[in-house]
């Protein structure tokens, strides 16, 4: 009997389709996360680009100028305070034929692909948390609630002084600190792609709970101060090296993926090329507040 027209068969489920799926799922995860945080679309950068975090100030002159007099110049100063290179990172995952035979492809391949995506997301977020903890707006408060409130207030005050819009404010706090506070309430958290968060909580538009934030600390950053940069794996002439990475469908290629069989070891390798970094434009508009335990 003839196969019904347009039936999807094994011939259409190609390795490249799986590569595209992996790249698309990673991008979709990030788009969901950036939507929660209110961050703009990722910005493409060339490999080797230097990222600069800045401090901005302006010496505003008197605006009461007599008719016909020269208007005095107000001196603006933007000082670079930190540098980071945009670099490509390479990852590889291997699954053996025995693992597929024992657990099936759905577990041995698909589940480990999911775990790989989560780890890649964690690499970017962990580096961002480490950077955010160097923020220069600091104070010590007695309680968790007061720390959150002061963190929000300090970044709003800073952006207002810089005459900049701050949009929504994102707060990052230690997972156990958040749940310790929630223990006496009926509030529950939400989770998206492994990121635990609350919306409109204690004055924060979004509060993200992370074990990468040390206990007893709260970090606040305006969404407009966060930028997600990426290197497009399709930008480089990797084909000249014999490297064929597949990117997702769309204009934002956050990762490149290549799957191949390793016949000499009866295994399958998944290669990932990624260059992503979350960055804050103004380091002096990040609040890092400490508070006493038990708050």
Predicted regions and their residues:
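Short acidic DE-rich linear segments
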Residues: 2-5, 135, 139, 291-295
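Protein-protein interaction and targeting regions used for scaffolding, dimerization, and localization
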Residues: 8, 12, 81-89, 278-294
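Assembly/oligomerization interface modules of large self-assembling protein complexes
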Residues: 15-89
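Extended, solvent-exposed, turn-rich assembly/linker loops in the middle of proteins
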Residues: 136-206
């Amino acid at each position: 009997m003839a196969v019904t027209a347009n039936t999807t068969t094994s011939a259409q489920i190609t390795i490249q389709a799986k590569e595209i799926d992996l790249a698309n799922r990673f991008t979709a995860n990030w788009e969901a996360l950036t939507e929660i945080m209110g961050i703009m679309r990722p910005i493409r950068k060339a490999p080797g680009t230097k990222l600069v975090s800045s401090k901005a100030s302006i010496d505003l002159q008197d605006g009461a100028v007599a008719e016909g007099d020269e208007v005095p110049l107000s001196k603006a100063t933007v000082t670079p305070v930190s540098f980071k290179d945009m670099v490509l990172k390479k990852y590889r995952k291997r699954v053996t034929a025995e693992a597929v035979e024992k657990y099936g492809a759905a577990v041995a391949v698909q589940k480990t692909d999911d775990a790989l995506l989560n780890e890649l997301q964690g690499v970017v977020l962990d580096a961002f948390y480490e950077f955010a903890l160097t923020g220069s707006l600091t104070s010590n408060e007695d309680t968790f609630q007061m720390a959150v409130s002061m963190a929000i207030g300090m970044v709003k005050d800073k952006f207002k002084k810089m005459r900049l819009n701050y949009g929504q404010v994102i707060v990052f706090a230690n997972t156990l600190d958040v749940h310790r506070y929630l223990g006496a309430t009926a509030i529950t958290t939400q989770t998206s792609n492994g990121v635990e968060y609350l919306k409109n909580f204690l004055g924060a538009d979004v509060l993200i709970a992370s074990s990468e934030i040390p206990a007893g600390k709260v970090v606040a950053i305006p969404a407009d101060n966060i930028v997600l940069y990426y290197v497009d794996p399709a930008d480089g002439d990797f084909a000249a090296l014999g490297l064929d990475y597949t990117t997702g469908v769309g204009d934002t290629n956050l990762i490149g993926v290549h799957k191949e069989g390793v016949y000499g070891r009866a295994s399958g390798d998944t290669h990932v090329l990624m260059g992503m970094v979350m960055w804050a434009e103004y380091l002096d508009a990040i609040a890092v507040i400490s508070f006493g335990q038990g708050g």
